[in-house]
Amino acid sequence: MRTDLEKNKHYYAVIFTSNLSNDTTDYSTTSEKMEELAKQQPGFLGVESARDHLGLGITISYWESLEAIENWKTNALHIEAKKRGREQWYENFHLRICLVEKEFKFHKGTL
């Protein structure tokens, strides 16, 4: 994740939880392209993502503002990818947008 989060007192997290369908043709390639595109968007702060062997995935992207999230939501290439996700890649998904007011970190070996 990018360290831009440390510079922002408050920021937003978009939590996207999904279960993949059996047809994941082009999913990985498109997912990588969307991450690269998101990184270029004004207000993007970082992303973390994980998926298990059964297809359950959680991606959390971090943004400076609700306006930045809305701009990403309405990006033409992102809209195309979301459409394909609904039609082909996902059995289901759940999206949450949260305001992050505090964050705490731990690194082994540091005080």
Regions found by a protein language model. Give the residues of each.
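Short, conserved catalytic or adaptor-binding loops enriched in Gly and charged residues
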Residues: 85-88
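Short S/T/G/P-rich N-terminal loop/turn motif that feeds into the first structured element of a domain
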Residues: 1-57, 68-73, 90-111
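Short loop-to-helix capping motifs
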Residues: 64-66
